[in-house]
Amino acid sequence: MKIIDLRTMRGPSYWSVRHHKLIVLKVDLQDLADTWSNAMPSLAAQLPELLPELEQTPPAENSKTIHKHPPLTREQLADGEPLGHVIQHVALALQRTAGMPVYWGKSHPAHQDGVEFVVFSYQEERAGRAAAEAAVQLVDDLCHGREIQLKPIIDELHEIREEEFFGPSTWSIVSEAASRNIPYIQLKNSSIIQLGYGVNQKRIWATTTSYTSHAGVEVAGNKNRTKAMLKDAGVPVPYGTTVYSEAGLRDAVEDLGFPIVTKPLDGNHGKGATIRIMNWEDAVEGLKAAQVYSRAVIVEQYIQGDDYRLLVVNGKLIAAAKRTPAAVKGDGKRTIQELIDEVNTDPRRGVGHEKVLTSIKADQHTLDILRNQELTLESVLPEGQTLYLKSTANISTGGTATDVTDLVHPYNLLLAERVSGIVGLDICGIDVLTSDIAIPLNETRGAVIEVNAAPGFRMHISPTDGLPRNVAAPVVDMLFPQGSTARIPIFAVTGTNGKTTTTQLLSHIVASKGYKVGHTTTSGIYIQGVQLQSGDCTGGQSAEFVLKDPTVNFAVLETARGGMLRSGLGFHTCDVAVVTNVAADHLGMRDIYTVEEMAAVKGVLPRTVRKNGWAVLNADDDLVYAMREKLECRVALFSMDEHSPRIREHAEQGGLAAVYEEGTLLSTKTAISFGLIGRRSFLLRLAAGLPSISKTPWPQLWLATATGLIKTTLSKHFGLLCHRLPKLRAE
């Protein structure tokens, strides 16, 4: 087998309007052309054994996918399946085995004999492309009886996932935004995520946001400054000092006594911290561990109690968790290493942020803890004895969390909300040591030991025990309060001829109403009338360029077939889509050989229009007119034939339509001669004018444009005759 072409779709495309992240493979089956799986006994016998995920059904939340795209079973392989279909399922199963839950795909023959199109979903683009190549090679090897090495493939995919997939905190915010129909864009080569479009966009970086104060982050990052500010505000904090050397450490120990804690002055997430130090030797080691991260080291009294994390968003406490360091419990038989291995078999544990818990690693810090207790990894722990393997309770080092949100005493709740305001953070993780979070902190002699910018959400959204909390919802509420919008109006134009002219006219109309327009054409990208890029800019990346611009509040996007076939659209939905026409141009390029296939490509655009938006279609073009049958949005038609039966039928049903009456423009007030306007030019102007005349309530952000473009203005510029029936009349 040979891969002829491999494309990555990133938005609605010819292959699927609903499924956006797709790999499109064009595979030459070569000597396996017309071969089905039942003709290859080694394939049917070995593949399910090598890749058990092939036969796994999607989880309940993907139940719709189960019926449309069921798993590939060994019975089906034995009965006979096309090899393109097998490749599709193998590519999906490889990704799922590596922790990426993808299920959708399809395959069908290409125009050339022995060539198949294989289309399947991906979670991470690089992983999808790697899975495509691996799937083709794997099926080819099995068919030809070659040796199979599957583990390196899965390891590579797993590594890609760990490198590129959102962390749990970021993903919780992104998925919450997506559930509210808020679009997102991951900025190139960055962990920064843009939520929303244009002037309405907000950004997140992990759990810092567009509203996160730089001063607040700086304060939280300097633990001495944080402690001083909290102490001045009456918040209990541990007594301590800052040292830079062993001499300073000795003075601090003489002042504080044991037990003590050492931690870097500007550290975070427990890095470099050592707690409950009981002797001078360990104090020196703690100093060295902290100075890996900061020359300045905080030495402070050790506060007895359990470790709690209080999460405050936008000034309100929204979650609390009790954290426990990574630990094992002895059974009197197995070694500490064996106990660690057993804990790591918990299916909830994985590498890094892959799952809700992180696998425990016996690192140098763990070995030091064991050494201090005269233990090694080969020691057998007595039955019932609990051994803590880390000095801090971070989830990222194997710790566990129990939700205690409903137990927080009102005094402690107020304290947490005050701390957030004192430090000046919109999202704030407050670490507290106390014997019981249900008792006021001033009664337990507990203390606030640390304040964190960019706190992790994993312990709250997926606690080991207790009720999961949707802590991302308050973040999205803060970024996009009720009544606000994340979107900007998007008008998109496609067709064989007239796209650029129509786009330019629409952009001009909208700009004349005071909007800051970004538009794309075959000549370049324009922001508020200024050309920022030149060349053919009608693809998805150019659309994203406009939608990422923070000054733009209206996008008008020329959308050509090349970009749609290359990578799909640069947006998922639009407000208005205009299709001017479909002609037999560019056939034979990118596997589009018929005008009907070209119409299917162009037809992607109107299918992305929101339900209360408009698809503006040319009623004189049979293929364009037929697009209305697949649409869920409202449809407006235009025609050069004032007696068009299609227009009449549409208008009789209450639809919006525009026609050209030869030589004369009818308006509610005037009759103006347009004898010098050519028919083709006028047709394009009709297409440009229609989206702007509707009085139907659209999103408040752009309602002013729709209603402001009154018929008199349109008559002056474009010559429109608009019909709404019953009673065929000009409006």
Regions found by a protein language model. Give the residues of each.
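Short acidic-glycine loop/turn motifs at beta-strand connectors
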Residues: 197, 312-316, 436, 660-662
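Adenine nucleotide phosphate-binding catalytic loops in nucleotide-utilizing enzymes
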Residues: 592-599, 603, 613, 633-731
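Walker A (P-loop) phosphate-binding motif
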Residues: 482-528
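ATP-dependent carboxylate activation and anion-phosphoryl transfer catalytic cores
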Residues: 1-179, 316-319, 324-338, 365, ...
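Conserved N-proximal alpha/beta basic substrate-recognition cap immediately N-terminal to
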Residues: 119-255, 268
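Flexible active-site lid/hinge loop adjacent to a nucleotide/diphosphate
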Residues: 531-650, 686
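Active-site nucleotide/adenylate-binding loops and adjacent lid/helix of ATP-dependent enzymes
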Residues: 85, 199-364, 410
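Conserved ATP-utilizing enzyme core subdomain
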Residues: 347-388
